[in-house]
């Protein structure tokens, strides 16, 4: 592509020349840097293959294998040229044709050989997490692996002073990690149903105690349904049945209270009426005594008047005289 771009301004415009240029397969040529660029950066292809943040001490059969690579660290080096990317990709495919099917051991060797391919590095990250978890329980197992020393060194200086916080600082587990490490990733967080069931399970004994009897009776149905969100159906039914029982009990108590109040009122009225009847009876007896007294008096007056009339019967003014 770079060759086509560089040849663009110098191409002739005749059809024969264009057909001659099109006969060439330019894609089979490797893209290389200019000699000036190579003179400015000698030995860069050897160090360009090394990924940022990695250490390498064992060379492989690379074009630069004649000069052993020393441990170097290049975290801030940036790849700004497209030609370097093409050159690295083609060079890695020539040296490692089975890059897509690497095992963790091959990934370790590829990492030591300074080949920046993302997929083998991901496999190596999973292998590194499993190995470091094994190293946490057994202090000296890393001598059995050829690249375990590099894998352990890549954890950084924070692995040794914070060894007791290993599980918090370890990389996220992958398919090669233990099931105990995969448990937090398989369950990222409780859903709404899990939260509701956990709330209901945590308050099984206190669901009915959450609301007092007065609150259940005085609360409206809409407000009660809003407070009962998150509880199970059985608990809601049981709480509503308790509310219905309390309302029926309250209604029965109010009816009983009304009946008692009415009974007391009737008893008071009865007592008052009885007292009035007694007063009336006393009045009747008093009137009867007065009547008897007046009757006796009238009889006495009548008897005394008849005697006076009998004494004067001989006179012409008496009534018997005219008869």
Curated annotation (Swiss-Prot):
Swiss-Prot/TrEMBL GO biological process terms: abducens nerve formation; fat cell differentiation; negative regulation of osteoclast differentiation; positive regulation of DNA-templated transcription; regulation of DNA-templated transcription
One Pfam assignment: bZIP_Maf
Keyword terms, alphabetized: Activator, DNA-binding, Isopeptide bond, Nucleus, Proto-oncogene, Repressor, Transcription, Transcription regulation, Tumor suppressor, Ubl conjugation
SMART domains per UniProt: BRLZ (SM00338)
Domain of life: Eukaryota
PTM (free text): Sumoylated. Sumoylation on Lys-32 and Lys-297 stimulates its transcriptional repression activity and promotes macrophage differentiation from myeloid progenitors.
Chain intervals with Low complexity compositional bias: 54-76, 192-201
Bias kind Basic and acidic residues: ranges: 34-43
UniProt biased composition (Basic residues): 129-143, 159-168
Domain bZIP residues, every copy: 238-301
InterPro entries associated with the record: bZIP, bZIP_Maf, bZIP_sf, Maf_TF_N, TF_DNA-bd_sf, Transcription_factor_Maf_fam
Entry's localization field: Nucleus
Role summary: Acts as a transcriptional activator or repressor. Plays a pivotal role in regulating lineage-specific hematopoiesis by repressing ETS1-mediated transcription of erythroid-specific genes in myeloid cells. Required for monocytic, macrophage, osteoclast, podocyte and islet beta cell differentiation. Involved in renal tubule survival and F4/80 maturation. Activates the insulin and glucagon promoters. Together with PAX6, transactivates weakly the glucagon gene promoter through the G1 element. SUMO modification controls its transcriptional activity and ability to specify macrophage fate.
Record remark on domains: The leucine-zipper domain is involved in the interaction with LRPICD.
PANTHER family with a match to the protein in the record: TRANSCRIPTION FACTOR MAF, TRANSCRIPTION FACTOR MAFB
Entry similarity comment: Belongs to the bZIP family. Maf subfamily.
Subunit structure: Homodimer or heterodimer with other bHLH-Zip transcription factors. Binds DNA as a homodimer or a heterodimer. Forms homodimers and heterodimers with FOS, FOSB and FOSL2, but not with JUN proteins (JUN, JUNB and JUND). Interacts with PAX6; the interaction is direct. Interacts with ETS1 and LRP1. Interacts with the intracellular cytoplasmic domain of LRP1 (LRPICD); the interaction results in a moderate reduction of MAFB transcriptional potential.
Name by which UniProt lists this protein: Transcription factor MafB
Gene symbol of the encoding locus: MAFB
